[in-house]
């Protein structure tokens, strides 16, 4: 006797198609392609949640470097001076790169004072 799956198969397929809503073309109507789309989207999301952390760190370093170079120093010299002055520590205490980047953008005067104080 032939088994068609009935409501179980329909529910499973409906679940995949609902997850593929918002996709373009056949990707949200064809079960097979919709399922591939959802799986690939999940893989990209997983990968990019990790890449996001790298990208933001790169951005913060670039901003700090640009702000410090205006004052005649390099990023590595500045970070070394911060570590020696115990402003930045390895265990996460003190200022981090995100804070320094925000300070450089939103309050350049305070950032310049910090640089001048640390680089003496």
UniProtKB/Swiss-Prot annotation:
One of its GO terms (biological process) is translation. Signal peptide: none annotated. GO terms for cellular component: ribonucleoprotein complex; ribosome. Coiled coil: none annotated. Keywords: Ribonucleoprotein, Ribosomal protein, RNA-binding, rRNA-binding. InterPro entries: Ribosomal_bL20 (IPR005813), RIBOSOMAL_L20_CS (IPR049946), Ribosomal_protein_bL20_C (IPR035566). GO terms for molecular function: rRNA binding; structural constituent of ribosome. The keyword Chloroplast does not apply. Belongs to the bacterial ribosomal protein bL20 family. Binds directly to 23S ribosomal RNA and is necessary for the in vitro assembly process of the 50S ribosomal subunit. It is not involved in the protein synthesizing functions of that subunit. NCBIfam families: rplT_bact (TIGR01032). This is Large ribosomal subunit protein bL20. It comes from Ureaplasma urealyticum serovar 10 (strain ATCC 33699 / Western).
């Amino acid at each position: 006797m032939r088994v068609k799956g009935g409501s179980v198969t329909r529910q499973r397929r409906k679940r995949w198609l609902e997850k593929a809503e918002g996709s373009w073309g056949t990707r949200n109507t064809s079960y097979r392609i919709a399922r591939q789309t959802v799986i690939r989207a999940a893989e990209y999301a997983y990968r990019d949640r990790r890449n996001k952390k790298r990208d933001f760190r790169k951005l913060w370093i670039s901003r700090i470097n640009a702000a410090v170079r205006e004052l005649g120093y390099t990023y590595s010299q500045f970070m070394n001076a911060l570590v020696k002055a115990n402003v930045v520590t390895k265990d996460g205490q003190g200022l981090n790169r995100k804070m320094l980047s925000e300070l450089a953008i939103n309050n350049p005067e305070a950032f310049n004072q910090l640089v001048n104080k640390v680089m003496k």
